[in-house]
Amino acid sequence: MPWPWRRKSRRTLARIAIEGPIAGGTRVRVLKAIEQVQERECPALLLRIDSPGGTVGDSQEIHAALLRLREKGCRVVASFGNISASGGVYVGVAAEKIVANPGTITGSIGVILRGNDLSRLLKRIGIRFETVKSGLYKDILSPDRALSEAERQLLQELIDSSYGQFVAAVAAGRGLEEAVVRGFADGRVFSGAQALPLGLVDVLGDEESARRLAAELAGLDPEKTRAVTFGKPPRKLLGLLPGATLLQQLSQSLSLELAWNGQPLWLHRP
């Protein structure tokens, strides 16, 4: 049931930003921000997404929270920035409307799981692993050996299950048939302009266009409605240093490889 139009916050447009890879820290911050938006009964939410995606479970939890927020009567509009791919798309399709820049990189609908076979390197430097396990597949993706065909099949079934969940969410969120979504959900990326005729986005425009659309959907005057950001991402000290952007990118890439190795991901990885 929609919220009553009484509080001053009912004239406030909420804004939440998702920046960078979606993982545990992002999930905690965004879920808390969504809870604050619900408590203040803001009539609309502008969801700014600039993310290549991330872990499956974290993306699903944010998606589910956004759907619950909409059920409470909050109008949700997603604004895609430089990139909103893979898990960024999964989160975005929970919105009522999606606005993307013509040059936004989006799509990359699919699942990826990577592991490292370091057996030849380990043998060369004289390191050998000793493994005691409770079941045949307990050490699957162990770096000291290659995958067996049975293990590869097991992981493919896992990937296919996650992929099916992704396709179903996009189809439901965008009002498309699953067969149509599967036609372009093969990991390829699109510009915002290419995504429009596919039905992945509703409008081409910038964040201001998305803000105005969110206000209009909530019955507010776009000229008089201010946006208040909830759950601001913490500023990192690294960002204050010269050459910080490159350092952050390198640090981020290394962190992803170490932390997410062996996990199914909804992530665009060029």
Question: At which residue positions do the language-model features occur?
Answer:
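N-terminal organellar transit peptides
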Residues: 1-87, 91-101, 112-270
